[in-house]
A protein has these predicted regions:
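Sec-dependent bacterial lipoprotein signal peptides
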Residues: 6-41
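A residue-level marker of the well-folded mature domains of exported/periplasmic proteins
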Residues: 41-345
Length: 345
């Protein structure tokens, strides 16, 4: 940005070539000085325009220029997790001078594919996807590849064999699932039957369930999974599915919800059945509402994700790509656990 203000006439040392200003004075009788003023304005005007449209400074240490546009298709912008992730992206994009075009796929694969096509027509500089259907998103990624637009996935990976993704940024969901399983073992006293409110078409959930089952097998092998319906990660569906599970499994001791909405849906069903405190609920994400439920005792605990960090690191990977660097193919962010003891701190 040009902070020097208006250009001023600079005195010339003796012997310097005659400049435009002096020519104007020498030939004042032949041509009005207005010609000089217009010429000078034209010259300085192009410099000012270039200065005003220059890329915004990047984050500290960034070599990448700003002024880039990134298309982001999020599978469900109503989910608290994705709102936090988007906030992390926006904050980091602002530091780097990037513009984000963020759209909601509304849990619709066809809509998400159309959004990618729209990004391509807009000639965005990079695309970020949180695929609704990991196994069906590949064809859209292929289209972006053909347009030479780099593609990144955040939270949920491309589960198909089609398409090239530069980098996948997500929690270590196997580790997070293992931590959730550890909580469940403690919650049910290392024995009994439990359920999983699943979403099997999503790669990150596949990893969570994998880690959860690994923990049960290692820490509390007497605990058995007796039901694992596809609740789609939605609260109302989880509530309905949990009611059915409770009817069919009178001795159920616990349930693992693969995200906070699933867990909170289970809490509602358990309360309606008069089983609060008898069927333990472990969730995943640890958003504000889930933390409040844990603090009140309605839930036993949660595996923690840090969605804002996922969002920020996604933009960092894109920045490195713009700068000609090669980011890691997989970037894992940390996970943790949150229990009632943590709520009291």
């Amino acid at each position: 940005v040009d902070n020097e203000g208006p250009r001023s006439t600079i005195a010339k040392p003796k012997g310097a070539p005659i400049g435009l200003e002096e020519n104007c004075l020498n030939y004042a009788r032949l041509a009005p000085c207005l010609a000089f003023a217009l010429a000078l304005a034209a010259c300085s005007g192009s410099s000012t325009d270039a200065s005003n449209t220059a890329a915004s400074p990047g984050a500290a240490g960034s070599a990448a220029p700003g002024g880039k546009t990134i298309g982001v298709s999020i599978q469900d912008r109503e989910a608290q997790f994705y709102q936090d992730m988007e906030a992390g992206m926006q904050a980091e994009a602002k530091k780097n001078g990037y513009t984000l075009i963020v759209v909601d796929a509304n849990r619709d694969n066809a809509k998400q594919q159309s959004q990618v096509e729209d990004f391509i027509s807009k000639k965005v500089d990079a695309i970020v996807l949180t695929p609704f259907d990991s196994n069906a998103i590949g064809s859209a990624i292929v289209e972006a590849n053909s347009a030479n637009i780099p593609v990144f996935t955040a939270d949920i990976a491309n589960g198909s064999s089609q398409g090239k993704v530069v980098s996948h940024i997500a929690s270590d969901n196997v580790q997070g699932g293992y931590q959730a399983g550890t909580l469940m073992c403690a919650a049910v006293g290392n024995s009994g039957s439990v359920a999983i409110l699943d979403q099997p078409e999503v790669t990150s959930v596949q990893d969570r369930v994998k880690g959860f089952k690994q923990a049960l097998a290692k820490i509390c092998p007497a605990v058995k999974v007796v039901a694992d319906p596809d609740s789609g990660g939605k609260r109302d569906k989880a509530n309905s599915d949990m009611g059915d599970i409770l009817q069919a499994n009178k001795d159920l001791k616990g349930v693992f919800g693969i995200n906070d909405d699933s867990a909170l849906g289970a809490v509602t069903a358990i309360k309606a059945a008069g089983l609060s405190g008898k069927v333990m609920v472990v969730g995943y994400d640890a958003g504000p509402e889930a933390r409040a439920a844990i603090a009140s005792g309605a839930m036993y605990g949660d595996a923690i994700q840090y969605p804002a960090q996922i969002g920020a690191q996604t933009i960092d990977a894109i920045r490195d790509t713009f700068a000609g660097k090669t980011p890691p193919a997989k970037i894992a962010t940390k996970t943790g656990t949150f229990t009632q003891a943590d709520a009291k701190k």
